[in-house]
């Protein structure tokens, strides 16, 4: 471009050219496009575009001008007003010059053409105008509709505005409330925060206080422990020092007495010319050495029995130096005897002086010493407390027997035949009595030996030295060997006794360690084997100082009573080696006498006194009274129901340093076995020997042995000092139990030693340790009445509800023994009053049995402190039924605490506490029981006796006077109008229960009782099973399933006086009933008169909620029709709803009228019109609506055609306004418009299960209420109605399910359900029955025959005719679905008759007679009363059902009628050969037996006889229609099915019947009759077997009846299934069925059996 631009510029350098030429060139160069610049080109382009646009405008203007000129030139001469000119124009323009013809040649023709053209145009315009007018009309219609819509829209908009305004207001209110509530919430939150802060502060303070308190508790516990330790140390030291002092004193005294005795014995031996007296001294000293035990220095030498026999000799001279008295419970004992340091008191030892009495054998000394009276100093005996004999002439004797008693042969019989080492706690007498023939001087000497040996110390503590010569009882050889060393002494003694034949020890006797009842054999009897029985003589002379002993201070421990008077001398006989010995007990302390029950003499000796004492002989070697001795005590019967075990203190008391022989206790007299002699209730109740209790519980020292035994002894005797010493020892088992299971705690609690119990509990003793019978320490203390021990044990968490082996609790034992304080403590601790013993007794039984009024009051009225501590402040809640609040109530205004179940509890024999009190004449106890509102005085025992029957005269009078008024409570539904409303079977009144009204019953209690009775009754009649009122009370729901409750009550009549719940009169209910002579209480339910439906619900048993729903439908929709099977109470429901509506409208101020019209076949449409007009239901359009309410009921609409009767009224009924009028043509040709107003209600009833045909057109215009037989309310109505009938018959009581009445009612209910199931299965809904016909079922207790007869009448009169008509109607070929039963043939064919008879027979057997509660024999008699039961079902079974495969048409079925090929075994059944048919029947029965089929008909003989009479075999079942064929197949399937008793599984596909051929499991299909209305539920695919298989598990042989042939057909598939697999379950997975009603049970139809087996479907 630069070059271009440059070249465009003129070049002035070429001057030589002339000027003209230059100018021309310059001009050319200017217009050269190529030389133009870009901007110049753009300018040039724009100029050219402007020129083009100007040219276009000029061209357009020229064209327009040309057109105007052309038009003016051509058409300017023409005028539109002249048609000729137009025609001429067209002519000239249309054709060429050649074709142009002159237009005006014929003006007429031209005019005609113009006219024709105008006519055509006019016609076209007229059609267009008509179309425009129609469109205009449509537009106007649409405008009108639009205006109406706009008006509606405006109305809706206005309503919405109003609603929005209201909602806005509500929202504002809610917002305001929310703000207020949020403010309150904030305030509450602030308050809560403040409270939480305070709570935290309080928690902090509380925790600080708790810490301080725990610290204080720890300090106090530590201080107590230190104090206890110091006290125990002080006690130990004191006792040791005291024992040392006693030892020294005793030693000194013994030495003096020994010197005197030695001198006297030497003289006596010299006079007796005895050759062996020299042996006594060495043996004496030797024995002394052997028994010695050091006090404080030596530990207890606890040698076992076997060891001690050999080691005894090693203990040497410690005896003389250190005689030890162990502080046991202070008792009479010998101060001379040294024992082990810690209290190993030699329980069984004859504890003599150190010189003599400590020896194991003193027989030589006794035998040689002359009988002398011991000096007073030698006989210083202190008794531990006042024993019963202390005040008598006979002083209490020491607890240890003198050694001679055991050594001498005479002693052996006393302990047991061979048990010399028995520890006689009344030593002198026992020893003396052993040798009644002895010289009195020798007896006196022996007496002195014994007395000195057992003299107690000043504190009454016996110092006993363990014997050293005793041999282990298990080794008789050792025993005899040891005894041989003592033979000389024994022979010396025996010379002074009457000679007896030598009686060696009994072989086979139990060893010492046994706790058994037989006496130990191998005891260390110091007598020689040849020693004979020693005859007992008079008691020895009493030492002069003995009586004074009773004046010594008694120990602090409580003394237990003794059994016998010591002043009363009596001879007790003890059987020893079958010989009886007498012992004089008068000089013995009763507290120390022990009885051995096992050796009770069978024949008492003539000397036996009524209250003999018994000698407990003591082994001279120190044998303890062991468990062998005590275990003999179990022979006595227990007074108390439990605690039959001897006390622990009777356990074997083994002495550690000696050989312990369990010496048996020998019973001296049979009379000593008398219970009740002991004051210890527990002892006597436990069966202890009364003589044993003083031994173990009296103040005298009990025999002591090993540490555990010592512990039990100390606990038994209450020796706190010894117990504390023992508890401080290490390694001691404080929970040690003897063979009877008695622990130390048990013994202490049983004997009431509270201090010992506290010590043991603090030491950790097991508080709930039980003995062998399950009794705990608390049981023992409660039985004995030791309430302080009970309180202490409870505070240590003893189990207050512990039950012994027989079920006795501490409360029971306390009640049994009348221990009021213990009962109160246990009740306050919260013990259970309802625990029962094994015999069914409760504490109430126990208290009543003893006649203890205080105990019974406590049980009935005392509350646990959890409620209130005071017995009289509390007010118990009122009991449900009849409560007494007695004026005479022993507890003032308080009410019983125990429930009625406990008061009325019966034991094994059926006896209640009232039976016991009445039979024993405890009138006060019976009166207290009668104060309880729940007492049932009519309760019967197992012998059907009431308390009145077994009562004494006084108690009978009391029961008759205190018995409650029994007022029947009845429910009334008001007066029901008789007639055709379906209420004929409804009872006006029903008794629901009897109210017990007592003098103490208040009006509040009465009101609660009535309310509870009503609630229970409503729940009982509406429950699913037979529940009693007691079972129903567990349900706390206020309303029953039918909707009734206490709110349904209108008023209550007390006799003739009105009363309302909660109302009170000045008189009590008792007085009011008596004064007004009210014989019943009637409850009136609210009914239609009050605008309620409660009475209708109760009368008809239709749930209240459903009735209220029906009423709502009528009031809301105005047109309601009730339809269901005949007898479904449609008329009753409609009429009751109408009554309720009428009274509601009248209460609202309207007048109301009910108009009933019964429709029949002749009821015409004109009559209906007159009815509507006359009742003012149809009113003229010109007339304004009336305020009157009209309710029209059209009954039995099934008898007319709904479409014909109501067809014209459908629209006016649906749209009730003048806009939808109904025109009525009058007879004179005029018409008038009517309409239905809003105040008209129309109800109709139809007794038809379903609508058909043209009636279905009516269905959409009405609201329909369908009353199905298999759905509520009809399904449960009959069950509830009959249950209420039974309750009324039993006067309010619900019988048990096994009652015959219940079974009969259940059968009637099952008949109705099974019958409808079968009829539905057959496809005959016309024959379905509602429950109305079954409401009249008679309820006669004990007479089921009446119900069966009623069922026969119902069957013959109603059921069978309906079934017959329905079957014929279905079997007829030309069946019109609209007319139902009316078109059945009047003259049915024989085939149809056969079908009817077969159907009746099958229904009768499967639905009616099946499950009848009558025995088979009676049922066979009544079966003849039923019509149609004798038809031979073999006809049905041998009928061939034709196969029809899936997808085949009916035409194909008719073609393929030839039966399938049979197998070679069976010939095909023939219609024309009766023989073959009967053979088929027989074969069928055999096959059924093979399959374990158990279905049989009632009368086989009659069936067989009638086989040829019913129909000719040539004509049997020659059915001519598909309906008949389908029906027969239905019947066949019903026969073969075992689950048709409740056909809830309805399947139209069925099995082929078995035809005895080889084909197996071959199903046949049948089409559903297209003319029959079948619900989809009734169709299901075919299964290989329809319902169930035949299985062995379901086969039952009928009782007492051989199986008979069954003519019922069986599906072929079942033969195969039964033969191939008989153990399969009755339901198969291949079975596919559609269930109706969701029933999950299939019933097996066993005809004429009393039970009906059911199996659930899988």
Curated annotation (Swiss-Prot):
Residue positions, PTM Asymmetric dimethylarginine: 495
CC terms in the record's Gene Ontology section: actin cytoskeleton; cell cortex; dendritic spine; FAR/SIN/STRIPAK complex
Pfam families per record: AAA_lid_NAV1, Ank, Ank_2, CortBP2
Top-level taxon of origin: Eukaryota
Modified residues annotated as Phosphoserine in this record: 1521
PROSITE patterns: ANK_REP_REGION, ANK_REPEAT
Subcellular location: Cytoplasm, Cell cortex; Cell projection, Dendritic spine
SUPFAM superfamilies according to UniProt: Ankyrin repeat
A molecular-function term among this protein's GO annotations: protein phosphatase 2A binding
Annotated segments matching region Disordered: 1-24, 203-235, 348-437, 451-475, 495-612, 1448-1478, 1538-1595, 1611-1642
Compositionally skewed regions (Low complexity) per UniProt: 385-394, 509-520, 1619-1633
InterPro entries, alphabetized: Ankyrin_rpt, Ankyrin_rpt-contain_sf, Cortactin-Actin_Reg, Cortactin-binding_p2_N
Main location group: cytoplasm
Start-end of each ANK repeat: 706-736, 740-769, 773-802, 806-835, 839-868, 909-939
Biased composition (Basic and acidic residues): 214-235, 1539-1558
Comp. bias (Polar residues): 399-418, 580-590, 1559-1569, 1581-1595
Coiled-coil residue windows: 119-276
Keywords annotated in UniProt: ANK repeat, Cell projection, Coiled coil, Cytoplasm, Methylation, Phosphoprotein, Repeat, Synapse
Assembly behavior: Interacts with CTTN/cortactin SH3 domain. Interacts with STRN, STRN4/zinedin and MOB4/phocein; this interactions mediate the association with the STRIPAK core complex and may regulate dendritic spine distribution of the STRIPAK complex in hippocampal neurons. Activation of glutamate receptors weakens the interaction with STRN and STRN4.
Role this protein plays: Regulates the dendritic spine distribution of CTTN/cortactin in hippocampal neurons, and thus controls dendritic spinogenesis and dendritic spine maintenance. Associates with the striatin-interacting phosphatase and kinase (STRIPAK) core complex to regulate dendritic spine distribution of the STRIPAK complex in hippocampal neurons.
Protein name per its UniProtKB record: Cortactin-binding protein 2
Organism expressing this protein natively: Neofelis nebulosa
Organism placement in taxonomy: Eukaryota, Metazoa, Chordata, Craniata, Vertebrata
């Amino acid at each position: 471009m630069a070059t271009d631009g440059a070249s465009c510029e003129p070049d002035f350098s070429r001057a030589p050219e002339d000027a003209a030429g230059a100018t021309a060139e310059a001009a050319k160069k200017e217009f050269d496009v190529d030389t133009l610049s870009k901007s110049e080109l753009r300018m040039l382009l724009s100029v050219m575009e402007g020129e083009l646009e100007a040219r276009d405008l000029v061209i357009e203007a020229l064209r327009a001008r040309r057109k105007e000129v052309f038009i003016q030139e051509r058409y300017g001469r023409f005028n539109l007003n002249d048609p000729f000119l137009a025609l001429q124009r067209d002519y000239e323009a249309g054709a060429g010059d050649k074709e142009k013809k002159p237009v005006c040649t014929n003006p007429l023709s031209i005019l005609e053409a113009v006219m024709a053209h105008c006519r055509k145009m006019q016609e076209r315009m007229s059609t267009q105008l008509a179309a425009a007018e129609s469109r205009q009309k449509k537009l106007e219609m649409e405008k009108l509709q639009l205006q109406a819509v706009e008006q509606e829209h405006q109305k809706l908009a206005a309503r919405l505005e109003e609603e929005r305004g209201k909602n806005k207001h509500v929202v504002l209110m809610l917002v305001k409330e929310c703000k207020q509530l949020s403010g309150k919430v904030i305030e509450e939150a602030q308050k809560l925060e403040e409270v939480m802060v305070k709570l935290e502060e309080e928690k902090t303070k509380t925790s600080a206080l708790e810490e301080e308190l725990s610290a204080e508790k720890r300090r106090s516990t530590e201080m107590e422990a230190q104090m206890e330790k110091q006290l125990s140390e002080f006690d130990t030291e004191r006792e040791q020092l005291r024992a040392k002092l006693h030892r020294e004193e005793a030693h000194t005294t013994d030495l003096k007495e020994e010197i005197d005795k030695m001198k006297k014995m030497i003289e006596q031996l010299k006079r007796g010319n005895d050759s062996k007296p020299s042996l006594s001294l060495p043996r004496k000293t030797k024995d002394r050495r052997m028994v010695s035990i050091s006090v404080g220095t030596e530990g207890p030498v606890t040698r076992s029995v076997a060891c001690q026999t050999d080691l005894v000799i090693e203990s040497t001279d410690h005896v003389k130096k250190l005689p030890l008295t162990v502080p046991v419970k202070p008792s009479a004992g010998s101060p001379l005897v040294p024992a082990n340091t810690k209290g190993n008191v030699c329980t069984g030892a004859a504890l003599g002086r150190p010189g003599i009495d400590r020896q194991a054998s003193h027989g030589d000394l006794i035998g040689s010493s002359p009988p002398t009276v011991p000096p007073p100093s030698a006989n210083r005996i202190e008794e531990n407390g006042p024993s019963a004999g202390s005040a008598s002439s006979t002083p209490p004797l020491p607890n240890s027997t003198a050694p001679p008693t055991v050594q001498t042969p005479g002693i052996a019989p006393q302990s047991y035949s061979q048990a010399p080492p028995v520890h006689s706690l009344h030593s002198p007498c026992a020893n003396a009595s052993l040798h009644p023939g002895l010289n009195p001087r020798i007896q006196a000497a022996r007496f002195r030996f014994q007395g000195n040996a057992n003299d107690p110390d000043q504190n009454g503590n016996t110092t006993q030295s363990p014997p050293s010569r005793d041999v282990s009882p298990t080794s008789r050889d050792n025993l005899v060997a040891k005894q041989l060393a003592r033979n000389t002494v024994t022979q010396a003694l025996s010379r002074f006794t009457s000679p007896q034949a030598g009686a060696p020890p009994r072989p086979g006797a139990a060893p010492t360690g046994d706790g058994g009842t037989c006496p130990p054999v191998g005891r260390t009897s110091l007598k020689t084997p040849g020693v004979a029985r020693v005859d007992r003589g008079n008691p020895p002379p009493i030492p002069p100082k003995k009586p004074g002993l009773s004046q010594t201070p008694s120990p602090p421990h409580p003394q237990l009573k003794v059994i016998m008077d010591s002043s009363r001398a009596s001879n007790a006989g003890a059987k020893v080696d079958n010989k009886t010995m007498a012992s004089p007990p008068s000089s013995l302390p009763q507290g120390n006498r022990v009885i051995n029950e096992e050796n009770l003499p069978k024949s008492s000796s003539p000397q036996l006194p009524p209250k003999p004492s018994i000698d407990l002989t003591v082994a001279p070697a120190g044998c303890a009274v062991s468990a062998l001795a005590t275990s003999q005590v179990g022979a006595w019967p227990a007074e108390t129901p439990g605690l039959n075990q001897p006390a622990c203190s009777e356990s074997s008391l083994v002495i550690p340093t000696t050989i312990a022989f369990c010496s048996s206790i020998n019973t001296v007299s049979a009379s000593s076995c008398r219970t009740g002699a002991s004051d210890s209730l527990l002892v006597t109740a436990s069966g202890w020997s009364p003589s044993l209790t003083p031994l173990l519980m009296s103040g005298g020292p009990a025999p002591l042995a090993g540490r555990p035994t010592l512990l039990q002894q100390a606990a038994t005797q209450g020796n706190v000092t010894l117990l504390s010493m023992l508890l401080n020892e290490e390694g001691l088992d404080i929970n040690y139990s003897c063979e009877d299971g008695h622990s130390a705690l048990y013994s202490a609690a049983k004997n009431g030693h509270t201090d010992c119990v506290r010590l043991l509990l603090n030491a950790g003793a097991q508080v709930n340790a039980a003995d062998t019978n399950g009794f705990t320490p608390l049981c023992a203390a409660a039985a004995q009445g030791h309430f302080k021990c009970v309180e202490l044990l409870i505070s240590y968490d003893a189990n207050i509800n512990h039950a012994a082996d027989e079920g006795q609790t501490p409360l029971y034992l306390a009640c049994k023994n009348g221990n009021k304080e213990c009962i109160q403590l246990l009740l306050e601790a919260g013990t259970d009053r309802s625990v029962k013993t094994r015999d069914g007794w409760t504490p109430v039984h126990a208290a009543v049995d003893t006649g203890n009024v205080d105990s019974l009051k406590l049980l009935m009225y005392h509350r646990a402190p959890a409620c209130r501590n005071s017995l009289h402040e509390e007010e118990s809640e009122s009991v449900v039924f009849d409560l007494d609040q007695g004026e005479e109530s022993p507890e003032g205004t308080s009410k019983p605490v125990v429930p009625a179940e406990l008061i009325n509890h019966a034991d094994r024999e059926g006896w209640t506490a009232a039976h016991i009190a009445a039979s024993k004449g405890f009138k006060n106890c019976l009166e207290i029981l009668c104060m309880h509102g729940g007492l049932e005085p009519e309760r019967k025992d197992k012998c059907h006796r009431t308390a009145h029957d077994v009562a004494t005269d006084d108690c009978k009078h009391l029961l008759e006077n205190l018995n409650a008024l029994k007022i029947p409570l009845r429910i009334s539904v008001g007066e029901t109008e008789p007639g055709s409303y379906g209420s004929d079977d409804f009872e006006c009144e029903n008794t629901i229960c009897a109210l017990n009204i007592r003098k103490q019953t208040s009006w509040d209690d009465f009101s609660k009782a009535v309310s509870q009775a009503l609630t229970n009754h409503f729940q009982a009649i509406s429950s699913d099973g037979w529940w009693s009122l007691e079972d129903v009370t567990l349900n706390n729901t206020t309303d029953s399933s039918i909707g009734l409750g206490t709110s349904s009550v209108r008023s209550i009549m007390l006799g003739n006086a009105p009363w309302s719940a909660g109302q009170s009169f000045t008189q009590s209910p008792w007085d009011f009933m008596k004064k007004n002579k009210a014989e019943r209480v009637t409850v009136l339910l609210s009914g239609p008169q009050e605008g309620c439906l409660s009475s209708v619900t109760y009368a008809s048993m239709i749930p209240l909620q459903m009735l209220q729903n029906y009423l709502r439908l009528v009031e809301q929709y105005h047109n309601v029709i009730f339809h269901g099977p005949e007898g479904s109470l449609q008329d009753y429901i409609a009429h009751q709803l109408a009554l309720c509506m009428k009274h509601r409208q009248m209460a609202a101020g309207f007048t109301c009228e009910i108009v009933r019209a019964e429709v029949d076949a002749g009821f015409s449409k004109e009559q209906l019109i007159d009815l509507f007009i006359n009742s003012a239901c149809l009113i003229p359009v010109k007339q304004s609506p009336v305020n009157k309410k009209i309710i029209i009921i059209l009954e039995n609409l099934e008898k007319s055609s709904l479409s014909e009767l109501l067809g014209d009224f459908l629209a006016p009924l649906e749209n009730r306004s003048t806009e939808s009028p109904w025109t009525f043509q009058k007879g004179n040709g005029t018409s008038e418009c009517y309409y239905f107003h809003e105040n008209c209600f129309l109800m109709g009833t139809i007794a038809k299960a379903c609508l058909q045909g043209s009636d279905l057109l009516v269905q959409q215009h009405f609201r329909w209420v369908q009353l199905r037989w298999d759905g509520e309310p009809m399904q449960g109505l009959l069950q509830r109605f009959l249950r209420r009938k039974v309750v009324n018959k039993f006067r309010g009581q619900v019988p048990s399910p096994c009652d015959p009445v219940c079974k009969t009612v259940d059968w009637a209910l099952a008949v109705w359900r099974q019958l409808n199931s079968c009829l539905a299965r057959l496809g005959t809904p016309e024959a379905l029955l509602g429950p109305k016909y079954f409401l009249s079922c008679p309820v006669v207790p004990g007479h089921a025959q009446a119900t069966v007869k009623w069922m026969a009448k119902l069957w013959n009169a109603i059921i069978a005719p309906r079934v017959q008509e329905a079957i014929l109607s279905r079997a007829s070929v030309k069946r019109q679905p609209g007319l139902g039963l009316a078109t059945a043939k009047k003259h049915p064919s024989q085939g149809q008759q056969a079908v009817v008879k077969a159907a009746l027979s099958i229904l009768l057997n499967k639905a009616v007679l099946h499950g009848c509660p009558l025995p088979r024999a009676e049922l066979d008699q009544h079966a003849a009363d039923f019509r149609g039961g004798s038809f031979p079902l073999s006809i049905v079974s041998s009928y061939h059902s034709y196969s029809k495969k899936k997808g085949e048409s009916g035409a194909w079925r008719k073609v393929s009628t030839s039966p399938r090929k049979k197998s070679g075994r069976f010939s095909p059944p023939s219609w024309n050969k009766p023989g073959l048919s009967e053979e088929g029947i027989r074969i069928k029965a055999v096959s059924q037996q093979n399959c374990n089929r158990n279905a049989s008909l009632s009368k086989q003989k009659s069936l067989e006889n009638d086989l040829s009479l019913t129909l000719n075999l040539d004509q049997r079942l020659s059915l001519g229609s598909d309906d008949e064929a389908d029906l027969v197949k239905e019947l066949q399937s019903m026969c073969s099915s075992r689950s048709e008793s409740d056909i809830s599984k309805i399947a139209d596909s069925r099995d082929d019947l078995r035809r005895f051929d080889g084909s197996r499991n071959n199903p046949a299909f049948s089409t559903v009759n297209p003319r029959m209305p079948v619900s989809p539920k009734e169709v299901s695919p075919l299964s290989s077997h329809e319902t169930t298989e035949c299985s062995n598990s379901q086969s039952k042989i009928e009782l007492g009846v051989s199986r008979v042939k069954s003519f019922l057909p069986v599906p072929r598939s079942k033969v195969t299934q039964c033969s191939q697999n008989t153990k399969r379950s009755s339901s198969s997975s291949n079975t596919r069925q559609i269930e109706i009603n969701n029933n999950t049970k299939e019933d097996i139809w066993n005809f004429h059996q009393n039970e009906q087996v059911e199996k659930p479907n899988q």
